[in-house]
Every structure is written in structure tokens, then in C-alpha cells.
């Protein structure tokens, strides 16, 4: 078994679709997401973010965190491991701001791939 560390990053949007896919495990790879860092770059607006993973190789999503509050100029860290099976997806997206302003959020994950 070979293992390697990977980094994944994303400019977080507001759509719960493939544009929010931060990482997808390869077809013959299992992965351990060691931590997810979600940074709100806005100096005025808080952000609410959602973190989801698939449980069946890419089609059925379950929330790891839902409407997680990230205050302005702050970072939220999900520091417990998330295990992904082959073809599973890690998705991060934000709820739209109530005042219709755009969200200014970035996400980063540290991942161990095992093949």
C-alpha cells in the first residue's frame, strides 16, 4: 500500500453542485481528510458554510456540518478525520448572504491518500 499527502483548496461558492467539490478520491484510492480549514475573508459579513461527503462512491451526500457559522475575518477548523472510500467526494459550499452580497470564503483540506 502506498500513501501520499495531498492538499485541496477551493474558492467557496453558493451552489450545492459539482462546483463545490473540493476533493474526489480516485477510483482505487481511499483517503483520510485530516482537517478542513474554512476562512471567511470578509471584514463585515459572517458566512454560513456546509460541508458534505458522499457515502457510496459519489452519489449520496451526507452533511458533516450544516450552516456552520464563520464570523467575519475568522477561520473555522474541522479537525477530526473524515474517511473517504474510492470515488467519494468532499463538497463545501456557502449559504447565500441575506443581503445578496457575495460570499468571500476559501477552504483548504489536508488529505492522506492510500492506494
Roles of regions detected by a PLM:
Residues 32-34, 47, 66, 88, ...:
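A generic structural signal for short beta-strands and their flanking turns/coil linkers
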Residues 57-89, 95:
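Intrinsically disordered, low-complexity Pro/Gly/Ser/Thr-rich segments with frequent PxxP/GP/PP motifs
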Residues 44-45, 57-60, 100-101:
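Short, solvent-exposed loop/turn segments that connect beta-strands within catalytic domains
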Residues 49-51, 107:
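Short beta-strand elements bearing conserved aromatic residues within extracellular beta-rich modules
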Residues 38-44:
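Short solvent-exposed strand-capping/beta-turn motif centered on an Asx-Ser/Thr pair
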Residues 1-31, 35, 94-115:
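C-terminal interaction-tip segments
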Amino acid at each position: 500500500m502506498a500513501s501520499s499527502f495531498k492538499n485541496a483548496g477551493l474558492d467557496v461558492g453558493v451552489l450545492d453542485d459539482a462546483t463545490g467539490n473540493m476533493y474526489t478520491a480516485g477510483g482505487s484510492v481511499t483517503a483520510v481528510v485530516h482537517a478542513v480549514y474554512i476562512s471567511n475573508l470578509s471584514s463585515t459579513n459572517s458566512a454560513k458554510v456546509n460541508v458534505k461527503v458522499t457515502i457510496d462512491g459519489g452519489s449520496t451526500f451526507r452533511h458533516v456540518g450544516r450552516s456552520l457559522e464563520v464570523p467575519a475575518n475568522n477561520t473555522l477548523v474541522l479537525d477530526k478525520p473524515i474517511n473517504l472510500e474510492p470515488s467519494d467526494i468532499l463538497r463545501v459550499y456557502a449559504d447565500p448572504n441575506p443581503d445578496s452580497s457575495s460570499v468571500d470564503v476559501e477552504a483548504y483540506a489536508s488529505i492522506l491518500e492510500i492506494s
